């Protein structure tokens, strides 16, 4: 048995970034947000950018900007539990649309129906770095004048028709938390791409207060840098109290501006992120070459024009009896659909259901790591794990339609 234990996701942080963060946290390094804002405006084609203490805070603010008091937002039926936290924090009613489990993109017929049921805004989330079909959703929403918020917290350097994920919606959400591909330890950003939303950002910026120094970010980042090494990750991973890899609800807090330490780290991360994106894509391509044509384990297909950033490589268990291999970082996706989130139920409109595609993803989706700490020996172990599953023999008659039947006729 190998001692190595691979983290499912890892966001690199350099010693230089940690030093800058320590300097900002101690007050020895003066850090302004102007440089970061200008870089993000250019990178994401935004009129203005509001830096926040988390991606959840950025989404709360986006909901406040687009959904009137007592209004309703449309959410994907399968997504991160932070969407629930944002809905609770914004106090909005939620309706659900389904996802296509072939692509992780919105099921457009389901989007059409949720619009007919009545919503004031639609949130589209890119999952695991896979692009969602923003253009198709925007076309449906435009007929009713409904804004589309692009949640690119997991965009991870992916693109859609050559545009970076996060640069497409009328408002965009970024997250710089640990495990999001590019990290500052914490923090998020709200991107405005219309004059009206930019003016709303300008007014809101004055209400978020002055930034705290944020020494906790540096402690957390240093711990991540050390303990996510494959030779050490086994130690925190076996401690139940840490809940590593689990879906944990975090109650919303009043949105604040980004902490100074996180801002200092982010300045460095923005200059090096492209290298990690390229490395993830190379690892994903290698693993995908081993899956091509398999019937037992299938890869999620990007939407037309989409190029994933592969925060993780997403795979579907066509039979439904596959077990995770946590020491390899091969784990299941989110264990609940949004309608099953206990905290969301008071905010869920009557009769709303996640849909069969979302339920299928809950039951069948696996992700495997692609990050830069996946070494050659880890890649071989992952390849061996994949090989033992793609050669699994499906029951007679199930090979061709097993996955399709499972979600379309549920």
Name every feature range the model reports, one short phrase each.
Residues 3, 7-57, 78, 280:
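Conserved N-terminal alpha-helix of the aminotransferase class I/II PLP-enzyme fold
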Residues 62-115:
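Conserved PLP-anchoring active-site segment centered on the Schiff-base-forming lysine
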Residues 102-199:
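Active-site phosphate-binding strand-loop segment of PLP-dependent enzymes
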Residues 62, 86, 133-137, 187, ...:
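A short acidic, amphipathic alpha-helical/loop segment
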Residues 37-39, 43-50, 55, 79, ...:
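PLP-dependent aminotransferase class I/II
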Residues 2-9, 178, 189-210:
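Active-site-proximal region of nucleotide-activated glycan assembly enzymes
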């Amino acid at each position: 048995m190998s001692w190595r234990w691979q983290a499912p996701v890892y966001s690199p942080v350099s010693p230089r970034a940690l030093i800058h963060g320590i300097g900002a946290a101690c007050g020895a390094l003066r850090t302004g947000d102007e440089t970061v804002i200008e870089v993000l405006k250019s990178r994401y084609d935004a009129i203005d950018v509001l830096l926040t203490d988390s991606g959840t805070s950025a989404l709360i603010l986006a909901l406040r900007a687009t959904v009137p008091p007592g209004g309703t937002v449309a959410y994907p039926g399968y997504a991160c539990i932070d969407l629930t936290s944002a809905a609770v924090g914004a106090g909005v009613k939620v309706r659900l649309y389904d996802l296509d489990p072939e692509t992780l993109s919105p099921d457009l017929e389901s989007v059409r129906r949720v619009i007919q049921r009545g919503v004031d805004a639609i949130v589209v989330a890119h999952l695991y770095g896979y692009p969602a079909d923003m253009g198709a959703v925007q076309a449906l929403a435009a007929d009713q004048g409904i804004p589309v918020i692009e949640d690119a917290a997991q965009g991870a350097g992916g693109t859609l028709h050559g545009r970076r994920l996060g640069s497409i919606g009328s408002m965009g959400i970024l997250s710089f938390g640990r495990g999001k591909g590019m990290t500052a330890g914490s923090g998020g950003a709200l991107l405005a791409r219309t004059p009206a939303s930019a003016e709303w950002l300008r007014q809101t910026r004055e209400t978020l207060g002055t930034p705290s120094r944020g020494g906790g970010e540096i402690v957390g980042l240093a711990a991540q840098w050390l303990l996510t090494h494959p030779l050490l990750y086994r130690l925190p991973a076996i401690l139940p109290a840490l809940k590593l890899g689990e879906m944990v609800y975090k109650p919303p807090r009043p949105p604040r501006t980004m902490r100074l330490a996180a801002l200092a780290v982010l300045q460095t991360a923005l200059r090096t992120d492209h290298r990690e994106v390229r490395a993830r894509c190379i690892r994903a391509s290698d693993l995908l070459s081993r899956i091509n044509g398999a019937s037992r384990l299938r890869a999620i297909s990007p939407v037309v024009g989409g190029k994933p950033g592969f925060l993780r490589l997403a795979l579907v268990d066509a039979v439904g009896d596959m077990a995770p291999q946590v020491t390899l970082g091969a784990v299941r996706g989110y264990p609940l659909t949004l309608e099953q989130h206990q905290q969301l139920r008071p905010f869920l409109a009557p009769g709303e259901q996640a849909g069969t595609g979302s339920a299928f993803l809950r039951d069948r989706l696996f992700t495997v790591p692609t990050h830069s700490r996946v070494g050659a020996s880890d890649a071989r172990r992952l390849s061996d794990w994949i090989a033992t599953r793609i050669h699994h023999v499906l029951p007679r008659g199930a090979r061709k339609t097993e996955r399709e039947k499972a979600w379309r006729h549920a």
